Amino acid sequence: MSQLDALREMTVVVADTGDIEAIKQYQPQDATTNPSLILSASALPQYASLIDDAVAYAKARSDDKAQLLIDAEDKLAVNIGLEILKIVPGRISTEVDARLSYDTKATIEKARQIMKLYNDAGISNDRILIKIASTWQGIRAAEVLEKEGINCNLTLLFSQAQARACAKAGVYLISPFVGRILDWYKAAEKKEYAPAEDPGVISVTNIYNYYKQYGYQTVVMGASFRNVGEITEIAGCDRLTIAPPLLKELAESNAPLVRKLEYKGEVKTRPAPLTEAEFYWQHNQDPMAVEKLAEGIRKFAVDIEKLEAMLAAKL
């Protein structure tokens, strides 16, 4: 049995890509996209018709240049999601514009808009996750959306404070990042880490155990991996979203895989929710989390602007 097949027996495997051919090859349960992956996918020739459709959709809705871009961008992300949903049996995660990460109201409106595009294409809410950055404002938006039946995937999650706030808000799923945490520590500490000592692995393990210890139903989906060792060290996590090169490596390995995450203790009484002040104080005690959250939002915003430049040339 390959490591990938062994992993599927203990964890829901998700493909972290917008590449339809890769998704067909590895047959994940779900798929996740983000602005960077949408940008990469848009360069593939098989997506040309999806771009043309998004442009035509935008032109039919507005004459305003700024609105045209917004509409085309949303429709393209949904078009790619629709293609992926023809292959995966589960859900697609589609991300809200990262530039709205500190605006609760705008995030809610954008999420509703994305979901409407899917609904108009005949896709029900239970096949979509709306990805939102795990800022205080994003978490508050997700809290509202979950009550409306719009499930959310809270991404760019690096701190225990973010994880606690997401759990209390009742979000459907969180994506704690592994590899980006490792990147920060390697740069800061000037050292290499064995998989079991990887700070990203330790972070996800702690979050997983915290959620199970207090009986939270929020799904923990480890994300952002730099090597297979990070994946095997958190085998047993609820879900793992994995890029095609690492899916390939797992599929080609027959090394034994041991389940690492499994909580068997008692469920305890939940702690009081964090106030906004407590959230910021605790999150800001972790310089890695502060820097990586801000950097992640900036990077996604840059790729959104590149995507808009590509679309603007066609509008």
Curated annotation (Swiss-Prot):
Please provide the record's keywords in A-Z order: Cytoplasm, Pentose shunt, Schiff base, Transferase
Can you quote a single GO CC term?
cytosol
- Which molecular function term from Gene Ontology is one that the record holds? transaldolase activity
Per the record, the major location class is cytoplasm
Assigned EC number: 2.2.1.2
Q: Which reaction does it catalyse?
A: D-sedoheptulose 7-phosphate + D-glyceraldehyde 3-phosphate = D-erythrose 4-phosphate + beta-D-fructose 6-phosphate
Name one process (GO BP) from the record: pentose-phosphate shunt
Per UniProt, the enzyme's principal EC class comes to transferase
Q: Which Pfam families match?
A: TAL_FSA
Would I find Aminoacyl-tRNA synthetase among this entry's keywords?
Answer: no
Q: In which pathway does it act?
A: Carbohydrate degradation; pentose phosphate pathway; D-glyceraldehyde 3-phosphate and beta-D-fructose 6-phosphate from D-ribose 5-phosphate and D-xylulose 5-phosphate (non-oxidative stage): step 2/3
Q: Which residues form the signal peptide?
A: none
Q: Which domain of life is it from?
A: Bacteria
Residues of the active site: K131
Keyword Magnesium assigned? no
The record's CDD domains line, in alphabetical order, gives:
Transaldolase_TalAB
The subcellular localization recorded is: Cytoplasm
Question: Sorted alphabetically, which InterPro entries does this protein's record hold?
Answer: Aldolase_TIM, TAL/FSA, Transaldolase_1, Transaldolase_AS
User: How does it associate, per the subunit comment?
Assistant: Homodimer.
Q: What is the similarity comment for this entry?
A: Belongs to the transaldolase family. Type 1 subfamily.
Query: What role does this protein play?
Result: Transaldolase is important for the balance of metabolites in the pentose-phosphate pathway.
> What is the name attached to this protein's record?
Transaldolase
